[in-house]
A protein has these predicted regions:
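Periplasmic/cell-envelope proteins involved in peptidoglycan metabolism and beta-lactam response
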Residues: 1-279, 367-379, 496-499, 526-536
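Beta-lactam-recognizing serine transpeptidase/beta-lactamase-like catalytic domain environment
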Residues: 76, 204-216, 255-300, 305-529
Length: 536
């Protein structure tokens, strides 16, 4: 029997081959059509998807302007720091927040709870930006960047630093974490100090590195700010105020020093103060600039204005003698601390005679005294431009009783700030010329408005020299071999119910040198409790 071998031979079928070629060519054609459609006819959607993955718009930071004193010494500067942020969408696409050593290291460095961070990212899976930490020092930020955590990036920013620490802190104020001023000069001049950030459109690779700058709008630079403050005088003023408040066991204090010929503020101190570089232990009360916000009745510091008004109205002459016996008005006894049957105008200031100025006030229409107070600066803001400044309070009455008119002459019935009182004494030092105040440096000459004849102010300013001499109430303000013209004052405080309480405000105001005044100074002690509460 013969065995047949079955041999499978390859067979060629033209029809099958043709169909295969048609299929291959058809697929290639479809691919080419699709590529042509995407690349030529309708590329926008593909480009949009690519841009969504790689294009990022970033702010171009502008450094906050520097604040300096009148000599150019820096008082507030910006230092470079970094912000750490996360792109939750990118992080989730790459596995989310992990619990490995790199994530643990970042969490420990930034004092973050890793579980809370993971929950935060998972609750915003499509977000593209969340802050993890702000104002981190660059060295720490660079170390975190080297961990190469998915979706975690750095952003350059700046933080405010105050080289002089607590010096002028209540005046300068401070900024928030976004570098926006929220207190003091930082807030009042925020627009000038911030400038305008720029924007740039960049393309990034999958690691977050910039590979192309598309467009950029440059930032508008911020302006620097030169204050009228002299850092050295500010330091001396603050040290003296701190010592005075502590020695007098006062609740708080304020002091203002003005350059008379320009109206520039050379020093403005408040106690208590704080360190703006570390505000953790400070209270809201520590932030107050008491020189512009606290109000009180000025007491005897207004007596020079009463005498000027009486001289201007011709009620008395510079050499007049006034009856200063105690007397009764509306059932209230008007008397002095000491007994003086009669005093000259100089004596009224030296002994701070309430009876003397009461007689002068009662001898003229009260409106004349109101006009003088207003002309010298009481009852309205100084125009310094600082946020939080009080306008004080000037009474508006239809009827003035004799007692009201008398007490108005020794500083009761109106409210003023330390800054307003300093402005008044700067006007006295300017021999009747009221100049606008300035917290920024300006150059003389500064024009002012005459509010009282020079001869009258000069005469009263000379009388004020007696207050610091033996027998006067301001001997503590005396400076050896140096002429000063001062006036002290004391007033009872008003309680929350609007009634006087057994607490006092004491103050000393004056100008120096008396022969040709260059500086006006006011010091206020709020509720001194170390024995005497009188100013001086």
């Amino acid at each position: 029997m013969l065995k047949k071998k079955t041999k499978s031979a390859a067979s060629f079928t033209p029809i099958r081959f043709g169909l295969l070629c048609v299929a291959i060519l058809g697929c290639l054609g479809l691919l080419l059509v699709r590529v042509g459609w995407l690349q030529i006819i309708s590329p926008d959607n593909l480009v949009k998807q690519e841009d969504m993955r790689s294009l990022r718009e970033e702010p171009v930071a502008v450094e906050r302007g520097m604040i300096s004193d009148r000599e150019g010494r820096p008082l507030a500067v910006s230092v470079p720091v970094s912000a750490i942020w996360i792109d939750p969408q990118t992080t989730m696409e790459k596995g989310g927040v992990g619990y490995g050593p790199r994530w643990q290291a970042m969490a420990e460095a930034l004092h973050l709870n890793l579980g809370e961070l993971a929950q935060r990212v998972q609750s915003h899976p499509h977000a593209r930006f969340l802050y993890l930490a702000r104002q981190i020092n660059p060295e720490q930020a660079e170390w975190i960047d080297k961990l190469h955590l998915p979706g975690v990036y750095l952003r350059d920013e700046s933080r405010r630093f105050y080289p002089a620490g607590h010096v002028a802190a209540n005046l300068l104020g401070f900024t928030n974490v976004d570098n926006q001023g929220i207190e003091g000069v930082e807030k009042s001049f925020n627009a000038q100090l911030t400038g305008k950030p720029g924007r740039r459109l960049v393309r990034k690779d999958k690691h977050g590195n910039v590979i192309e700058n598309i467009t950029e709008v440059p930032p508008v630079p911020a302006h620097n700010l030169q204050l009228s403050i002299d850092e050295r005088l500010q330091t001396v003023t603050e040290d003296a105020l701190d010592n005075a408040v502590r020695w007098n066991k006062a609740e708080s204090g304020a002091a203002v020093l003005i350059k008379i010929d320009t109206g520039e503020i050379l020093a403005m101190a408040s106690y208590p103060d704080f360190n703006p570089n570390n505000r953790d232990s400070a209270t809201l009360d520590d932030f107050r600039n008491r020189a512009i916000s606290d109000t009180f009745e000025p007491g005897s510091t207004v007596k020079p204005l009463v005498i000027m008004t009486a001289l201007q109205q011709g009620i008395v002459q510079p050499d007049s003698v006034v009856d200063t016996h105690p007397f009764v008005l509306d059932g209230h006894r008007i008397r002095d601390v000491g007994y003086y049957p009669e005093l000259s105008l100089t004596g009224i200031l030296q002994k701070s005679s309430d009876t003397g100025v009461s007689h002068l006030s009662l001898a003229m229409p009260v409106q004349h005294l109101i006009d003088t107070y207003k002309a010298f600066g009481f009852g309205e803001p100084t125009g310094l431009g600082l946020t939080g400044e009080s306008a004080g309070l000037m009474p508006h009455r239809r009827y003035w009783g004799q007692l009201d008119r008398a007490t108005f002459a020794f500083g009761y019935g109106l409210m003023v700030t330390p800054l307003q009182l300093a402005h008044v004494y700067a006007t006295i030092g300017g021999f009747g010329i009221a100049r606008p105040l300035s917290i920024t440096r300006i150059d003389p000459p500064v024009m002012g408005t005459r509010v009282m004849p020079e001869s009258i102010v000069h005469s009263v300013e000379h009388m004020m020299e007696s207050v610091a001499l033996p027998g006067g109430g301001g001997t503590k303000a005396a400076v050896r071999d140096y002429r000063v013209a001062v006036k002290t004052g004391t007033a009872k405080k008003i309680g929350p119910d609007g009634k006087y309480i057994d607490k006092y405000v004491a103050y000393t105001a004056g100008v120096a040198p008396a022969s040709r005044p260059q500086f006006a100074l006011v010091v206020v002690m709020n509720d001194p409790s170390n024995g005497s509460y009188y100013g001086g």
